[in-house]
Amino acid sequence: MTTSEPYERAFDEDIQRGTTEPCPECGGPVRTNSAETVCADCGLIIDEQSIDRGPEWHRDDADTAKRTGAPLTPARHDRGLSTVIGSGQDARGTALSSEKRRRLARMRREQSRGRWRSTKERNLGHGLTEIRRIASALGLADSVRDQACQLFRTAQNERLLKGRSIEAMAAASVFGACRCNGESWLIDDVAPMAQVGQNRVENAYTVLNEELGLPTPPVSLDQFVPRLASDLGCTDVVRRRAEELVVQAVDAGITTGVHPSGFAAACLYMAACVHDAPLTQADAAAAAGVTVETIRSHRDRLLSIVE
């Protein structure tokens, strides 16, 4: 009984791959395997120990995940590369003994001491933490938060923090990122979230805008209508009518020098009155952060162009 090899090649045989480029010495054909690139005629070794830059094929199994981790983020001073040492439980959720908990506490203390290589990094970490807190309180998107963090980094590199509060510059960076992205937030909305007074936040933003030349577009009144309508619980019909009133007011030229949030609230109040929606002047003023007299003044202006 004759036997034959069931496979076309042995398992330890190198896979030969041809290339289109000829040998630089004799012009003969070139063969490439997993270790080297050799000319088939003259035996010249053209390349060896090449790196396989192709994709890595493996099982897509959550239990065997490798080289995974959180993505890099500008919202942390080290881009998110620092190690976080847990406490209380291990990776399986099992409670740790008292001796291991004390050991982890000592490791966390030493790791915290080694996080900051300089005072500059410590100030950067404090400022970015403040930015994350303010962005979370305002419900900003991660992209706006990351842009605010990058703006704070630029301000620190340009030495704009010298003689100024870190908290004020952090709040100013958040407001600057909102302005650059066309978000309907005023400095009156951002400053109360900061740990310093509004005057210091305004001064810090003025420095940022003048020194860095922020590309801040003009504030548009129609940007405030959707957010105020959501806060006041207005219907889509009322919101659309308020947006129409804003367009009419801009065309009539009565919006010059007005408080944008207050005028948008007045448009919502007028639209609610037209559609018999339950919205009072006090509620509209509270949502916009203005007085009732401001709502009435803008209402009278709107009545002059509507009639």
From Swiss-Prot:
Q: Which Pfam families match?
A: TFIIB, Zn_Ribbon_TF
- GO CC, any one term: transcription preinitiation complex
Q: Which GO terms describe its molecular function?
A: DNA-binding transcription factor activity; TBP-class protein binding; zinc ion binding
Q: Where are the residues of the annotated region Disordered?
A: 54-121
Q: Which domain of life is it from?
A: Archaea
Biological process (GO) annotations?
A: DNA-templated transcription initiation; transcription preinitiation complex assembly
Annotated InterPro entries: Cyclin-like_dom, Cyclin-like_sf, TFIIB, TFIIB_arc, TFIIB_cyclin, Znf_TFIIB
Mind telling me which SMART domains this protein's record contains?
CYCLIN (SM00385)
Binding site residues for Zn(2+)? 23, 26, 39, 42
Q: Which UniProt keywords apply?
A: Metal-binding, Plasmid, Repeat, Transcription, Transcription regulation, Zinc, Zinc-finger
Give the Basic and acidic residues compositional bias ranges. Answer: 54-66, 107-121
Q: Where are the zinc fingers (TFIIB-type)?
A: 19-47
Residue ranges of the sequence repeats are: 129-212, 223-304
Its biological purpose = Stabilizes TBP binding to an archaeal box-A promoter. Also responsible for recruiting RNA polymerase II to the pre-initiation complex (DNA-TBP-TFIIB).
What family is it from?
Answer: Belongs to the TFIIB family.
- PANTHER family named among the record's database cross-references: TRANSCRIPTION INITIATION FACTOR IIB, TRANSCRIPTION INITIATION FACTOR IIB-RELATED
Protein name listed in UniProt? Transcription initiation factor IIB 5
Q: Source gene?
A: tfbE
